[in-house]
Amino acid sequence: MEEKDESEQSISAGRQEIRKRRRPSQPMVDKSQQTEVTEKKKQLSIPQSSGPKAALSIGNIPGSKLNYECHRVSSQLQQTWIKRKRVQDMADKSLQTETIAEEKKEEIKLVCEAVVPEEKPAAVEVGPEFPESVREVEVPPNRYSVQVKIDRSQQTTCTGDWTMMNFPQKEKLDKEQQTYFSESEIVVIGWPTNSFSKSKEGAQKRKSSGNIFLSEHPEFQPTTSSNEEIRRPSISRTVSISPTKKDSPVPLEDEKDVPVEVQPPAAEEISAEEQLPLAETTSEEVPVAVQPPPAEEPPLEAQPSPTEEAPGDEAPAKVEPTPAEEALSEKPPAEEALVEIQPSPVEEAAGDEAPAKVEATSSEETLLKEPLTEVQPPAAEEAPIQDTPELQLSPAVEAPAEEAPAEAEPPPAEEAPAEEAPEVQSPPAEEAPAEEPPEIQSPPAEEAPAEEPPEVQSPPAEEAPAEEAPEVQSPPAEEAPAEEPPEVQSPPAEEVPAGEPPEVQSPPAEEAPAEEAPEVQSPPAEEVPAEEALAEVEPPPAEEAPAGEPSEVQSPPAEEAPAEEAPEVQSPPSEEAPAEEAPEVQSVPAGQAPAEEPLEVQPPPAEDATEEEASEVQSLPTDEAPAEEGLGFQSPPADKAPEEEAPEVQSPPAEEAPAEEPPEVQSLPADEAPAEEATEEVQSPPTEESPAEEAPAELQPPSTEETTSEMVSVEKQPSLTEEPFITPISLEETSAEVLLPPFEQTPADEALVENVSPVDQAPKEADVLVEKLESGNLDDKPKSEEPLERDTIPKDSSGTKNEGVSFEIKGVIHIELE
């Protein structure tokens, strides 16, 4: 036991000792460790408490305990101060972080410089204030600067700059886009704001106007920005605004053409006029031009022409002047017509075209018309027509060319002046100036009144449509020249000659139509384009009316697009109205039925649209009545014309729109037609192009063409009606003219239309026309051939352009829709 105890005790003793040793040792160890830890902790805590200071203090450590302690103290003070400051600044972390870096720097400095550490101790001794102050002085500045820098860099980079930059950029982008849209929208809004479609166009013109300048030679540029540019060109066309147009457009809208155009016409006209027509044109043109519409149109046309015309029309017609002149030239050639129509330069272009066309046509038609007028000696006319058709066709197709040709031709024949003036004038002049007076003159009178100026002018306005209409109408105008005498004339003539016009128209129309129809038809193809243009034009009218009516017509146009679509749609309307007309037209349509149908439809639509539109817009009725009255049949044409006009206008609009977008609906049709037309028209110089397009149109249009032809016929008919149409045209015209698309259309259209017009007229003659159209249309009949021939040319010439143009136009159309 003892041993055990001892052992235990020993063990225990040993254990106890060990334990004791351990205990004391442990406590010692613990203390030492603890102490060390404590010191470390203190150090760490202090630095840690310093936070940033930790590093600094560490940095100081190399310097010396003094520095370290002093610094540490200072850091504590600083830290406290910093905390206060942080709280105040609320920049805790950033400040702290910066502070740490700065403090490190300071520490380094302190370490490096004993003085600094000493100072700090002194500072410490002095009190927190000194370090604080020191710190403030040194650190804060650095810190602030650093912080500022950091903050700025961070904020600026991330927050401030990005935000600001982004915002501005975003704003800019948004604004640009928005603005861009706004402009468009505004423009759109503007359209409503302006007056009717025209207003739109005016607005559009304005909108485009800047662009339009570009557009001014959109023909070239449209390609550039097919959509906008084209649209603008279209717009320009539509606007007719060549920049000048812009004003013009406004006036156009207001005046519809007269004032507006006047200027351009003058200038342009002058150019055109310059051209020969110059004097004459000037006169006439002026009259017509006066009717600025024409002028405007010139602008319109010019521009459009340039664009469009330039493209085809102008090229041909304008060909001469095309580009530069284009407006001028355009006008000049067109101008001639243009000039005289120049009044509707656009129109002119269109008109020009119309005039030219008309002129050409006119010449041609004049020939034709002359014949018409003559057809007023139909026979002569016929010959001329055919001749003209041919011419015309050429004119039509050629119209551009012809225009040039016509122009040239007429110039020769008419001598540009004659033609030109004749054309418009010529028709008048040629037309027998009497006619011209009647026609142009009369038209001027009337025309001025209704037709040519109207037509042209109106056409201008309308003319684009009218012109188109002119063309259609112009054709009417033109035709009207031809017809115009009849139509315009017709209105005059028609009015008086209504019979005759019908007759004239009829024969001419018929013949011309037939022929022309063929031609038209050919043109149909061409004309289709023309027609299409017409249709398109019609759409323009439709559209334009639609423009005013656009929807309506446009719808029709859209529908019309269908119609000629447009035609057709229009047709429906036409049909509707034209049902009656349709018959007639339809009749023609009947013959032409298929194509015609659209035609018919279209005319009806045109009529309808037009009518409504025209009526609506126009007083189509009135017009129509007259037209109808004169045309009677034509009334439908009137309707149609109006409609057509509307369509045409619409088309222009449509085209424009179409060409532009709206037309697009219309455009569709219009576009299609317009596009086509635009294309065609644009193309028409495009017309010519139209031919191509036309070809397409023709192809396409074959029916379309037919339709178009028909349409054209019908439309043309409306052209006949055109007079009424014109009236509408005036309104519409402005639009259309403004639309220019008509213009656009006009070129080809016009020629075509013109051709068609005859056809249209034919519609009066519908039967004959139908037969002829049908034959012609389908066959393109001799005329067709001729026209075709020309058509072909246009097709090729214009075709190429046409396609290009078409694309552009289409693009434009899309844009337009936007």
From Swiss-Prot:
Molecular function terms from GO: calcium ion binding
Any one GO biological process: negative regulation of protein sumoylation
Bias (Basic and acidic residues) ranges: 773-794
Modified residues (Phosphoserine): 25, 57, 182
Compartments, as annotated in UniProt: Cell projection, Cilium, Flagellum
Keywords of the record: Calcium, Cell projection, Cilium, Flagellum, Phosphoprotein
PTMs per UniProt: Phosphorylated by PKA upon spermatozoa capacitation conditions.
GO CC, any one term: sperm principal piece
InterPro entries: FSCB
Primary residence: other
Region listing for Disordered, in residue ranges: 1-61, 195-727, 773-805
Compositionally biased spans, kind Low complexity: 490-511, 544-560, 697-715
Function: May be involved in the later stages of fibrous sheath biogenesis and spermatozoa capacitation. Inhibits ROPN1 and ROPN1L SUMOylation. Binds calcium.
Subunit structure, interactors included: Interacts with CABYR. Interacts with ROPN1 and ROPN1L; the interaction increases upon spermatozoa capacitation conditions.
Protein's recorded name: Fibrous sheath CABYR-binding protein
Organism: Bos taurus
Gene: FSCB
